[in-house]
Amino acid sequence: MKVEKTNLEGVLKIILDAFEDYRGHYVETYNEGLYNKHGIDIKFIQDDISVSNKNVLRGIHGDQETWKLISCLEGEFYLVVINNDENSLQYKQWESFTLSEQNRIQILVPPKFGNGHLVLSERAIFHYKQNTYYNPDGQFTILWNDPEFNIEWPIKRPILSERDKVGHFVD
């Protein structure tokens, strides 16, 4: 396992090791002791999976208290992480990553950050661990095309949920 800093303070890129042979491959997706050795001391208490088809864009969602560990179990998606912490020097900055079942990348997203993903393959399975239980009342939704961020999405007309169509612009 390799852990790398990203351009956003607090966001980490984790590249998982794989054991491969003629039968296929094996990947350990989480081991608390190993993550602790890399300075990631977060107690995750909820896991969620989202299955989406090509051109579906989910997000940008976040809250004030949740750490998320995001990975792709199948397919490929374009992930955007946004710093939504008004007290941060990096407020409104974003970074993108491509996650796939082949590259075995995980992204650790801190509280006060938002994330959204666009499915690039025919289908993708998005998996994330959280250190808090989901609280719909504490969520924020930022519009995927908010001009304040000028995010470079590789699509002009994604498939969106009603929630994501009515997100808000950031002032």
Feature-to-residue mapping (PLM):
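Non-catalytic, conserved peripheral segments adjacent to functional cores
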Residues: 1-102, 123, 128-171
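Conserved metal-binding segment of the jelly-roll/cupin
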Residues: 99-122
